[in-house]
């Protein structure tokens, strides 16, 4: 009987993965160990998890809920018990300077693997990353736009990079395997309707046409894509796999703009100091005001 672990099941990505595992109808013999910080929040989003499993013949997988911190190796030892694959969907909104959540979770997971009794079964980590960190996909975005996004989300991207370095070292050590999932901008966090997606092989340098990535993808389609990647993990170990939409996406740019603005201001504050940032902002406003006044005059 296969067993998965899912970290971050109450977030937009994790809940999309869990929803597909629960309702796709192809996971009857599957056990999913779900780690969340708040069990009540998970049950509010998925009330059916609080009810008895229908029957032995049900197509719904067996769900085991663990409550705790993803950076605690003791908790992860229990969550990873018998698991052959981990969906790593732990993240936080925005990109606050100094964030280390993803790399700390990676370090705790690797420590938990070291503590597991020998012989260990093989474990594959499906780590959500970003197309901005995949050279093949990032080059498709206008350079100025890419630089602005990387500046605004610098802290979150640095956290992801460090986590990936840890996974690479752990794979070399033989502790685990990993696959990196690189979506474009993600939209419609509360949506549940899928409209279609396609995986992108970023290792085939001759097939440029099929490496093209749309700029938007829904969380719902990302969840399904991550489940497909899980089913094909053996052929994708060590790769960065792109995901692109093939259908319409309900776009929520206002939410993303808020995250970019918050991250950008935080990065400016960190590099130049809040007072200097405020002075610069006032100068820009005065300059724009002067230009508008001169145009009207």
UniProtKB/Swiss-Prot annotation:
Membrane topology, from the record: Single-pass membrane protein
Question: Which locations, inside or outside the cell, does it occupy?
Answer: Membrane
Pathway recorded for this protein: Mycotoxin biosynthesis; sterigmatocystin biosynthesis
* Keywords carried by this UniProt record: Membrane, Oxidoreductase, Transmembrane, Transmembrane helix
Q: What is one Pfam family matched by this protein?
A: NAD_binding_10
User: Which segments cross the bilayer?
Assistant: 277-297
Q: Name one GO molecular function term.
A: oxidoreductase activity, acting on the CH-NH group of donors, NAD or NADP as acceptor
The biological process GO terms on file are: sterigmatocystin biosynthetic process
Question: Cross-referenced InterPro entries, in alphabetical order?
Answer: NAD(P)-bd_dom, NAD(P)-bd_dom_sf, Polyketide_Oxido-like
Domain of life (superkingdom) = Eukaryota
GO CC terms of this entry: membrane
Induction section of the entry: The genes forming the sterigmatocystin biosynthesis cluster are co-regulated and induced on oatmeal porridge or the fungal isolates were grown either on oatmeal porridge or in YEC medium (0.2% yeast extract, 5.0% corn steep liquor). Expression is positively regulated by the cluster-specific transcription factor aflR that binds the palindromic sequence 5'-TCG(N5)CGA-3'found in the promoter.
Coiled-coil zones: none
**Which Enzyme Commission number(s) are listed?**
1.-.-.-
Q: Which family does it belong to?
A: Belongs to the avfA family.
Q: What does this protein do?
A: Averufin oxidase; part of the gene cluster that mediates the biosynthesis of sterigmatocystin (ST), a polyketide-derived furanocoumarin which is part of the most toxic and carcinogenic compounds among the known mycotoxins. The first step in the biosynthesis of sterigmatocystin is the production of hexanoate by the fatty acid synthase (FAS) units stcJ and stcK. The polyketide backbone is assembled by the non-reducing polyketide synthase stcA by condensation of the starter hexanoyl-CoA and 7 malonyl-CoA extender units followed by cyclization and release of norsolorinic acid.
Q: What is this protein called?
A: Averufin oxidase stcO
